[in-house]
From Swiss-Prot:
Monomer. Keywords: Glycoprotein, Signal, Storage protein. The keyword Glycoprotein applies. Disulfide bonds: none annotated. GO terms for molecular function: catalytic activity; nutrient reservoir activity. GO terms for biological process: nucleoside metabolic process. May play a role in nitrogen storage. Residues 1-24 form the signal peptide. To wound-inducible poplar endochitinases. Bark. Induction: By photoperiod. Short days stimulate accumulation, while long days inhibit. Glycans are attached at residue 70. The gene is BSPA. This is Bark storage protein A.
Length: 312
């Protein structure tokens, strides 16, 4: 558990940060990610500057950092995984800080290597929880995922039966709860990202490791989120064929659901670090994927205005 910062010893640390200097009491952008690799990409870039020597605060074991990213005011936090950690940490961020919108960057696996390969960055248009299952009783009505279809060497009956993919219930302040499957990225921010990143050049090499091709930004795909990593090619193909999902991760849908429930703008940047069913990329390629996703997130952040509060 991280050591407590000076602010964390105050009665109301967040309020104190916001009151102590009116110049920082404005709406910030929330930057969230899950891993040490993601945080290292941010720190290695040299683009982040803390507001002061003591501009971090610990809440519920998470450390929140206030500063600027290439001149844009942000609060960033490493959430950890799986999805419940992302949702919990993001909710704390939105409740305790003045956040205008949420930017997530992180790693994902490609489910379609014809579309995306390691080093590419995906900016999906919609994400979904594909790990919420209704596991059917053997011999009952068939669900979408039929385990017998994957018997080897021949298809047939399987005691695991079938699985139906469930919708999730979304709550919001202004609407009655509703069941949804696909969670759309904020349209205005998605459009802004496509404009800001349309000619973006990504990094091809890190240390002595270079990608075999020129990495690219891919717009408009769909993404799958669950609490398990998709390394199996057959299941990756199933998600691609049945849901048109091109990437899979453990966090994006949590970002979407929490942001939508709080009526906050949000966008997702995924650095592709592997292809389902193929040999896992080495640590340098994985870091390069994180770094490219971070670069895309930063360029987007610097392209949008941040509203100010009255005290400015």
């Amino acid at each position: 558990m991280p050591q407590q910062s000076m602010q964390a010893s105050l009665i109301d640390p967040i309020a104190e940060i916001e009151r102590s200097n009116c110049k920082i009491a404005h709406l910030r952008l929330g930057l969230v990610f899950t891993s040490d690799n993601n945080e290292r990409a941010l720190q290695d870039s040299g683009l982040y500057s803390p507001d002061s020597e003591d501009s971090s605060v610990d809440i519920a074991g998470r450390r929140f950092h206030s500063g600027t990213l290439n001149g844009s005011s942000i609060v960033y936090v490493k959430t950890g995984s799986p999805s419940v950690n992302m949702a919990t940490t993001l909710q704390i961020l939105l409740v305790r800080f003045n956040i205008h919108g949420v930017i997530y960057f992180g790693n994902a696996g490609s489910l379609d290597k014809k579309t995306m390969v390691p080093g590419d960055v995906s900016v999906p248009q919609a994400v979904a929880f594909t790990g919420v299952w209704n596991w059917k009783k053997f011999g009952s009505e068939k669900g979408k995922l039929v385990f017998g279809d994957f018997n080897y060497p021949e298809n047939g009956e399987n005691l695991l039966g079938t699985v139906e993919y469930e919708k999730i219930k979304m709550f919001s302040p202004s609407e009655a709860p509703k069941e949804v499957f696909w969670l759309p990225i904020t349209k205005s921010w998605y459009n802004a990202a496509t404009e800001a990143l349309k000619d973006m050049k990504l990094r091809k090499c890190y240390s002595d490791e270079c990608l075999p091709g020129k990495p690219k930004v891919v717009f408009g795909s769909k993404s799958s989120t669950s609490d398990f990593y998709v390394r199996n090619k057959a299941y990756g193909d199933f998600l691609n064929d049945n849901f048109d999902a091109k990437t899979a991760d453990t966090a994006s849908a949590s970002v979407a659901l929490t942001s939508l429930s709080n009526e906050k703008l949000f966008v997702v940047f995924q650095g592709v670090s592997n292809v389902a069913g193929e040999t896992s990329s080495n640590s340098r390629v994985s870091y390069l994927a994180s770094y490219n996703a971070f670069l895309a997130a930063t360029k987007f952040i610097n392209s949008i205005p941040t509203p100010r509060l009255a005290c400015e």
